A protein has these predicted regions:
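A short beta-loop-alpha structural element at the N-terminal edge
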Residues: 7-21
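Acetyl-CoA-dependent GNAT
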Residues: 13, 27, 39-98, 109-111, ...
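Amphipathic alpha-helical recognition patches that constitute DNA-binding helices
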Residues: 18, 90, 135
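A short, aromatic/hydrophobic, helix- or strand-capping loop or linear motif
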Residues: 31-38
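Conserved beta-strand-loop-alpha-helix junction that forms the acyl-donor binding cleft
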Residues: 96, 100, 125-137
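A short glycine-leucine-enriched loop at secondary-structure breakpoints
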Residues: 102-107
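Conserved GNAT acetyl-CoA-binding A-motif
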Residues: 109, 116-128
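Conserved active-site tyrosine of GNAT-family acetyltransferases
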Residues: 140, 145
Length: 147
């Protein structure tokens, strides 16, 4: 069994190229995602700007899971800037297929939930999942999400 060093940290502008490559890879690994073989339609400059915007916001999170220095998963919470709905976070979590069923998705989601609880802004989290993705549905229910 291979050992990995896990590092969780917020995305930085310098991660833009690696993040695009990661999202393009995971988009082709699963048909449960809205991303597909076409990948993410952002260039490196646009991704860097997106990351910078997320980092500057008090109601958004873009957390990477790095295994031995390579992106293996991510969780994000995005929310609107409009006052009436800025407390509602949309959760997105994805893990490379090579690391499915090893607890990385749970680790990422638990970190995101902890962040949301301490954010002073986010009061409700929502996510979308295909019901045929039984492992994800089980995880989300286990962490308190309702379908």
């Amino acid at each position: 069994m291979t050992e990995y060093e896990l590092c969780l940290r917020e995305a930085e502008k310098t991660d833009a190229a690696d993040l695009i490559a990661f999202l393009n890879q995971v988009g082709s690994e699963s048909d449960y995602m809205t991303l597909d073989e076409a990948g993410i339609l952002m260039n490196q400059e646009e991704m860097a700007s997106f990351i910078e915007h997320q980092a500057a916001s008090s109601n958004q999170l873009y957390l990477l899971a790095l295994l031995n220095g390579e992106i293996a998963g991510l969780v994000s919470i995005t929310a609107d800037f409009h006052e009436r709905i800025r407390h509602i976070g949309q959760v997105f979590v994805v893990v490379k297929k090579a690391f499915w069923n090893q607890g990385l998705g749970r680790i990422l989601l638990e970190e995101a939930l902890t962040w949301a609880e301490s954010s002073h802004v986010i009061r409700r989290l929502e996510l979308s999942v295909q019901v045929r993705n039984e492992r994800a549905v089980h995880l989300y229910k286990d962490l308190g999400f309702e379908l």
